Regions:
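N-terminal signal peptide c-region/cleavage motif recognized by signal peptidases
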Residues: 6-8
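Beta-sheet-dominated interaction scaffolds and their linkers
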Residues: 11-42, 47-49, 86, 161-172
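Surface-exposed binding patches on compact interaction domains or structured appendages
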Residues: 12-15, 41-99, 201
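Short, solvent-exposed loop/turn segments enriched in Ser/Thr/Gly
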Residues: 25-31, 95-96, 108-115, 173-177
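Asparagine-centered strand-capping/turn motif at beta-strand->loop junctions
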Residues: 34-40, 101, 181-185
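Short, hydrophobic/aromatic beta-strand segments
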Residues: 40-48, 55-59, 110-111, 161-162, ...
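Terminal connector regions
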Residues: 49-52, 102-151, 230-269
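Short proline/glycine- and polar residue-rich coil/turn motifs
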Residues: 87-94, 211-220
């Protein structure tokens, strides 16, 4: 049984930090800490692949993977190595994994990407509802895979986004917001999108917020709950702000860029 989990969750009892890795060309190294707080050992394997987040046709987020990246892709997969790559992490044991970069000598300035995979095996989940008169219990062995973004920065790096096609609609008891974001510069854009629906008196009646990672372009769709009593008919304005800040990342890891603001009138019949 294989499960894909966010890093904030326990991967088969193994805790992983940090949940995003950025390596500078001057040091060419990074690290990852694994900790097993459980009572059973966990077999850990590390690997990497090239991929980046995109939006699907409905506006949801998904990870696009490229098995054999072409030369024009900024892939760091072939020259980032983890030490050790395999280990048995005992109960209450902590392990530091070193990440070493050996980029080509002619590497151009910019940002290069990889996805680090931490695969943890160990433990089991009992299968309920399986009757056995002999008293034999049934359980599934678990394998949990955690995917962590890795970015390698060399020389002058810059980023930003352009926003377009802002759209909004009231769908049942929610506000649905969608827009297109195109990245500028030579590095992924890490930021936060915030939206606020205000009435004619300037009162905020609904808000939406989401972290962003724009590697090329995307058209995310976000929803926010509306007041339980509903909204009266009339004109409202949606105000959207996209800023290069993230609550889940240290400020020094987020490349600064000018904020983007847009607005749209929303009419309720």
């Amino acid at each position: 049984m294989v499960m894909l989990l966010p890093v904030a969750l326990r991967a088969q009892g193994v805790l992983i930090a940090p949940h995003a890795i950025i390596i500078d060309h001057r040091t060419r190294s990074g690290s990852l800490t694994l900790y097993n707080p459980g009572d059973e050992p966990a077999e850990i394997t590390l690997s990497s692949f090239f991929g980046y987040p995109v939006s699907d046709p409905s506006g949801g987020f998904e990870l696009k993977t490229v098995d054999q990246p072409e030369p024009d892709y900024p892939s760091a997969v072939k020259w980032i190595e983890a030490f050790p790559k395999r280990m048995l992490l005992g109960p209450k044991q902590r392990q530091t994994v070193r990440l070493l970069a050996k980029p080509p000598a002619n590497l151009q300035d910019g940002e290069y990407w990889a996805r680090l995979v931490v695969n943890a095996k160990g433990g089991s989940v009992p299968v309920e509802g399986v009757a056995d008169s002999s008293g034999v219990s049934v359980a599934l062995a678990l394998e949990v895979r955690t995917i962590i973004p890795l970015q390698y920065r060399k020389g002058k790096v810059a980023t930003g986004v352009r926003a377009s096609r802002l759209d909004a609609a009231i769908e049942h008891d929610s506000l649905a917001v969608r827009l297109r974001l195109d990245r500028t510069g030579n590095a992924a854009y890490l930021g936060t999108l915030r939206g606020a629906l205000v009435d004619s008196a300037g009162k905020v009646v609904a808000t939406v917020s989401s972290p962003l990672a724009v590697y090329y372009d995307m058209e995310p769709r976000l929803t926010a709950p509306l007041p339980a009593a509903g909204l009266p008919a009339g004109r409202y304005r949606l105000k959207v702000d996209v800023a290069s800040e993230r609550q889940d990342l240290p400020p020094n890891l987020v490349l600064a860029s000018p904020p983007i603001r847009d607005s749209l009138e929303v009419r309720l019949p």
